[in-house]
Amino acid sequence: MARKSLSSRQARREGLVARYADRRAELKRLVTHPDTDLSARDDAVRRLSRLPRDSSRVRLRNRDVIDGRPRGVLSRFGLSRVRFREMALRGELPGVRKASW
């Protein structure tokens, strides 16, 4: 089980990403667009660097929705491989069956 501080940090980052997503996307579009003049591009880079570091999507980590485990997360279910196996064997995941061939 992940520490509560890690889960709260992740939640704070998710909020920042959602809040700054439009602004960040617009600035990145200005920076990467080939027709943007140099002064506007420099200004966009400067404004982009002033945004909060945690507002970038790459700072997010996929975590198990139940216990917050950071590794081995199956994104389709939002569960770690360990939790997925436990729940699947108990029949708690609809439509999931153990493979047999």
Swiss-Prot record:
Residues spanning the signal sequence: none
InterPro entries from the UniProt entry: Ribosomal_uS14, Ribosomal_uS14_bac/plastid
Keywords attached to this entry: Ribonucleoprotein, Ribosomal protein, RNA-binding, rRNA-binding
Annotated GO CC locations: small ribosomal subunit
Pfam family, one: Ribosomal_S14
Entry GO MF terms: rRNA binding; structural constituent of ribosome
GO biological process: translation
Top-level division of the source organism's lineage: Bacteria
UniProt cross-references to NCBIfam families, sorted A to Z: PRK08881.1
Annotated family: Belongs to the universal ribosomal protein uS14 family.
Subunit structure comment from the entry: Part of the 30S ribosomal subunit. Contacts proteins S3 and S10.
Function: Binds 16S rRNA, required for the assembly of 30S particles and may also be responsible for determining the conformation of the 16S rRNA at the A site.
Name of the molecule in the record: Small ribosomal subunit protein uS14A
Originating organism: Salinispora arenicola (strain CNS-205)
Chain's gene name: rpsN
